[in-house]
């Protein structure tokens, strides 16, 4: 995640370490924080691998810029949908502000993948709710109060994913319009039907 964010920020302008920390912590906060011990070794690694380069140095403060090799690496990271699947919801929304670097079809690819990702969670949670209904009828393994508390937690998660799904549908509609107006070509396919929220 931090490699993605560092390269993403450098696609906009050169930055120094202190500014990296401030901006990244604003993006991932309020409780998650990137430390100096995590950031500076990563900067060293990226520079050694040719992804970034020092363009200014004042005392102990160095300003970095992204290289062409770094831009290619960033592009691959943006389109990666298989790494860290359990944390992909967070990664997706961190990518959205940097969609400007992608072609229209690539943006829609990420959006459609995330729609399917949300759908998979909704289908899974629907199955969990059905299972809880079976437990309630059979009164096995769990007490009624335990079942009720579990159902409440599942419904909460379901509502969150349903909201995310609808937000991404709106994002997709905006992207299709943007592609039609700005890129001059329509790449949008029919958006999937939203999964209805479980009652």
Regions found by a protein language model. Give the residues of each.
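Positions in alpha-helical segments
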Residues: 4-8, 94, 109, 152
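Long, low-complexity, intrinsically disordered segments
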Residues: 193-199
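Residues in soluble alpha-helical coiled-coils and helical-bundle/repeat scaffolds
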Residues: 11, 15, 29, 101-102, ...
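Mid-protein regulatory/catalytic core that forms ligand/cofactor-binding pockets
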Residues: 108-190
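Amphipathic alpha-helical dimerization/coiled-coil segments
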Residues: 77-127
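Basic helix-turn-helix/winged-helix DNA-binding cores
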Residues: 1-91
